[in-house]
């Protein structure tokens, strides 16, 4: 009887097995690519931190600049380096903002490299240790 009981239990267990078809695991949507910046302002460091005075000047200008609709701070590095990604509605306005911030960037700095650039690649930057 024991073999018969085992056979019955085995048949019952097989009959109770799930017949559901496994579904593929859904993959998450790809991460959103950051929107292109109309103007990018970069604050770097030569080992002494970013140029805080310049950061304050640029932030003060941006606080009163109506043509800039969005400022996205993108940190990187280990010494508080970061980029500001500026959104400006019109290309002509972006160029004006670019030139105004470019006028704030010092021509030379042995402390911290800073730059402002347009998507076209046009850039105004400090000359520093490598120059």
Named regions from a protein language model:
Residues 109-124:
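A short amphipathic beta-strand at an alpha->beta junction
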Residues 17-20:
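Bacterial signal peptide processing site
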């Amino acid at each position: 009887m024991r073999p018969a009981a085992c056979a019955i239990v085995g048949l019952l267990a097989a009959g109770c097995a799930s017949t559901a078809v496994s579904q593929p695991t859904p993959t998450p949507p790809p991460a959103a690519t950051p929107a292109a910046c109309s103007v990018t302002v970069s604050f770097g460091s030569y080992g002494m931190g970013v140029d805080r005075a310049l950061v304050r000047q640029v932030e003060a200008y941006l606080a009163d600049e109506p043509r800039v609709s969005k400022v996205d701070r993108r940190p990187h590095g280990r010494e508080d380096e970061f980029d500001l990604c500026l959104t400006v509605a019109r290309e002509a306005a972006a160029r004006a903002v670019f030139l105004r911030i470019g006028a704030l960037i010092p021509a030379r700095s042995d402390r911290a490299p800073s730059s402002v650039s347009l998507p076209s690649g046009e850039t105004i930057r400090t000359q520093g240790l490598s120059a």
